[in-house]
Amino acid sequence: GHFLQHPILAADLCHLLLSLRGNTATYNQIFCTAGPEIAESRTYYEMIADILNVELQINETPVDVHLKENPNSAPFLCHRIYDLAKLKASGAHVPATPLKEGLRQHAESLITSNA
């Protein structure tokens, strides 16, 4: 629950990708991309529980215990934050949907598609 993440809304990612077309400043470049907010994993799941109006239960497992049982998961046990300065400087669309709003939109789309 303590690792930092930098999630992006799929619609923001699509907008970003479309903004690359014809933008020669982005050709042959590699960019990091993410949403505008960084959140601790615990906070991320608290937001989802709040949006769904359900109780959240988090059972933390110490990292060393998890790694011993799941050695292939090592690449995922880290903070995931990104510098968007190069993306912004290129003139491409920079994702701007606030995290809670993006989670709300995503949850609503999943609920309505399964209705």
Model-assigned labels for residue ranges:
Residues 14, 19-72:
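Mid/C-terminal beta-alpha module of Rossmann-like enzyme folds, strongest
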Residues 20-24, 90, 109, 113:
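Generic structural signal for alpha-helix termini and adjacent loop/cap motifs
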Residues 10, 40-42, 65-94:
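Conserved C-terminal active-site "lid" loop/helix of NAD(P)H-dependent oxidoreductases
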Residues 47, 51, 70-76, 89-91, ...:
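C-terminal accessory subdomains/tails of enzymes that are appended
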Residues 67, 97-115:
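Amphipathic terminal alpha-helices
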